[in-house]
């Protein structure tokens, strides 16, 4: 499960307004890869963008979780890259194809069970150059609101992942580039991009 437009600066750069409630969409489990794996650039995609995100890993079956009880259902946290073909996103009017290709959801490097989201820095570098730099406190909807909202729609299962939105600074990843996402306390997720297939 993914949350869109959850940082005001990113909503602005996409030409949108800050939403009144979380905007959610789904990425297939076949989009998931691990740290060090290669992001495959599909031939249909003119460009592919990076999006640094905090990921929540669910630890138990849950439905309609009250905000004050979300910690009871969280197994831990990790990092995510919500890889996106921006042209397909604009063309389709919804996000499934643009964000659903195989390898379009790198996760890792590990799951941290003692992490508490607060004001930690979230950043992304592309070939060593900083492209995104913000703090988790900049999220519009925080973890309790996200889990409460998502679980009001669907039953969540152990191992489900919720990625929580990206800050401003999104942009394309060139062929054979290296993208690295960091969140203080969660380590670094690094992946390479293939040549366009």
Where are each of the predicted segments found?
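Extended, compositionally biased flexible segments
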Residues: 1-45, 50
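Catalytic-pocket segment enriched in acidic/His residues
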Residues: 10, 16-18, 86-197
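Short helix/loop capping segments that flank catalytic or ligand/cofactor-binding pockets
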Residues: 11-12, 35, 65-67, 88
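Ligand-binding beta-strand-loop-alpha-helix segment within the catalytic cores
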Residues: 52-54
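A structural micro-motif recognizing beta-strand termini
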Residues: 59-61, 110-111
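Short helix-loop capping/hinge motifs at secondary-structure junctions, enriched
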Residues: 62-65, 115-117
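N-terminal accessory regions of nucleic-acid-interacting proteins
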Residues: 63-77
């Amino acid at each position: 499960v993914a949350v869109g437009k959850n940082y005001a600066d990113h909503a602005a750069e996409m030409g949108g307004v800050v939403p009144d409630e979380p905007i959610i969409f789904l990425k297939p489990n076949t989009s998931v890869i691990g740290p060090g794996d290669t992001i495959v650039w599909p031939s249909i995609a003119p460009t592919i963008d990076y999006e640094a995100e905090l990921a929540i890993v669910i630890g138990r079956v849950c439905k309609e979780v009250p905000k004050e009880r979300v910690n009871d259902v969280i197994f831990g946290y990790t990092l995510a890259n919500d890889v996106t073909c921006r042209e397909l996103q604009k063309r389709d009017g919804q996000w499934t194809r643009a964000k659903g290709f195989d390898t379009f959801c790198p996760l890792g490097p590990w799951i941290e069970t003692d992490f508490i989201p607060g004001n930690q820095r979230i950043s992304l570098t592309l070939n060593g150059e900083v492209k995104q730099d913000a703090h988790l406190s900049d999220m519009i909807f925080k973890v309790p609101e996200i889990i409460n909202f998502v679980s009001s729609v669907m039953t969540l299962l152990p191992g489900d992942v919720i990625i929580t939105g990206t800050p401003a600074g999104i942009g394309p990843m060139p062929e054979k580039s290296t993208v690295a996402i960091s969140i203080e306390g969660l380590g670094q997720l690094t992946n390479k991009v293939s040549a366009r297939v």
